[in-house]
């Protein structure tokens, strides 16, 4: 019995020491920030930092919605869109399509931008659900107009310049992941 108590005490001391030593080396996990898109581009949420965002779209089926991004400094930015899905009742077998458009204010008004993306340059970023991609696109040559589950857009911006990101999704209310770097 004494051996068991000594063993338990030794184990407790070792575990306590490990906990105390490992705590300073832990990296905090940062969850994706959630933002809600708006059907009015002028009232859309304005993202001002790089990072990963979960964007919620509460507009009805076949309606556009917007978010904005204002560049914190001059440079090339990569926007990665992925994991498009319905907000409620999502099943992995659903097949939906959508589009992403990027607009910038110019001296002539708001203008759609041609951006570098998977497979070339395009004004329209065609996106789809994972099931659609697996059934119809996977294994084919990727073109700028291909329906992809994950798609990037590269754009050069000046400090303080704002882009408007418009999405359209056939599944109605939806969400997606947006990574800005």
What is the role of each PLM region?
Residues 88-114:
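Short, surface-exposed beta-strand/strand-loop-strand elements in extracellular ectodomains
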Residues 75-76, 154-170:
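Noncatalytic modules at the cell exterior or secretory-pathway interfaces
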Residues 140-155:
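Signal that preferentially marks extracellular ectodomain short beta-strand elements
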Residues 24, 83, 169-171:
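Surface-exposed loop/turn motifs at beta-strand-loop junctions within extracellular Ig-like
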Residues 76-86:
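A short beta-strand element within beta-rich, extracytoplasmic domains
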Residues 65-67, 89-98, 149-153, 166-181:
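Edge beta-strands of jelly-roll/beta-sandwich modules across compartments, strongly enriched
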Residues 26-68, 74, 118-120, 130-131, ...:
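Non-catalytic extracellular/lumenal accessory regions of secreted precursors
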Residues 1-27:
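Sec-dependent N-terminal signal peptides of Gram-positive bacterial secreted proteins and lipoproteins
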């Amino acid at each position: 019995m004494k051996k068991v108590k000594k063993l338990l005490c030794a184990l407790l001391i070792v575990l306590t020491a490990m906990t105390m030593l490992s705590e300073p080396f832990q990296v905090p996990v940062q969850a994706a920030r959630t933002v809600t898109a708006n059907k009015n581009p002028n009232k859309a949420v304005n993202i001002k930092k790089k990072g990963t965002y979960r964007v919620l779209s509460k507009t009805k089926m076949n309606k556009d919605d917007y978010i904005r991004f204002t560049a914190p400094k001059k440079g090339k930015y990569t926007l990665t869109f992925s994991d498009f899905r319905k907000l409620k009742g999502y099943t992995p077998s659903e097949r939906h399509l959508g589009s992403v458009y990027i607009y910038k204010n110019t001296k002539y008004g708001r203008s759609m931008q041609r951006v570098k993306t998977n497979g070339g340059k395009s004004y329209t970023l065609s996106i789809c659900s994972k099931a659609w991609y697996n059934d119809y696109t996977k294994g084919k040559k990727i073109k700028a107009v291909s329906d992809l589950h994950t798609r990037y857009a590269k754009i050069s911006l000046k400090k303080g310049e704002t882009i408007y990101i418009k999405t359209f999704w056939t599944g109605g209310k939806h969400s997606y992941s947006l990574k800005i770097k």
